[in-house]
Amino acid sequence: MKVTAAFAGLLVTAFAAPVPEPVLVSRSAGINYVQNYNGNLGDFTYDESAGTFSMYWEDGVSSDFVVGLGWTTGSSNAITYSAEYSASGSSSYLAVYGWVNYPQAEYYIVEDYGDYNPCSSATSLGTVYSDGSTYQVCTDTRTNEPSITGTSTFTQYFSVRESTRTSGTVTVANHFNFWAQHGFGNSDFNYQVMAVEAWSGAGSASVTISS
């Protein structure tokens, strides 16, 4: 969900701890998970077999929603997508989104966003270059907030693309490996989706996931 902590700097040590190897999971079975958190706040439709979904929301959306398609078990496999995404004046993300079971963490690889950059109000971890662009990387701790296990305290990880885009291939492993230098578990994955999230304003998205 959205990040609200105050921005703080972070010194990066010269020698990083050993990084867990990413877990590769076969996706031969195709998309098998529908993310529908408060999809009733807009018009959410999807075709799981085709790997497509759409979300339309009107100004005055009353709460946070996260909708999308993906996999019951996440991995560091690359994800290729194409989208039509419009969120001008909306606090919204178009992102690879998912959870790690332990240490519990929520993560976003933000490809495009509306009027709010989550790294503007979180702890900076620096930058990582991937897929033709620099990504700002940041983290936040959420205390007693909704999670995959109910209400809990967990860490959020964000990579926010500076040269925003609405189609391409996301090399997920590049982000997981960078985050792992800062406590990201890089294993024991819960679900992973290509998602749209918003909690204000109006917007629309039509997304196709091809891998």
Swiss-Prot record:
Its main location: secreted. One of its GO terms (biological process) is xylan catabolic process. It catalyses: Endohydrolysis of (1->4)-beta-D-xylosidic linkages in xylans. The keyword Transferase does not apply. It comes from the Eukaryota. Residues 28-210 form the GH11 domain. InterPro entries: ConA-like_dom_sf, GH11/12, GH11_AS_1, GH11_AS_2, GH11_dom, Glyco_hydro_11. Keywords: Carbohydrate metabolism, Disulfide bond, Glycosidase, Hydrolase, Polysaccharide degradation, Secreted, Signal, Xylan degradation. Disulfide bonds join 119-138. The active site is at residues 106, 197. GO terms for molecular function: endo-1,4-beta-xylanase activity. It is found in: Secreted. Its EC number is 3.2.1.8. Residues 1-27 form the signal peptide. GO terms for cellular component: extracellular region. The keyword Lipid biosynthesis does not apply. Pathway: Glycan degradation; xylan degradation. Belongs to the glycosyl hydrolase 11 (cellulase G) family. This is Endo-1,4-beta-xylanase 3. The lineage of its organism: Eukaryota, Fungi, Dikarya, Ascomycota, Pezizomycotina. The gene is xynC.
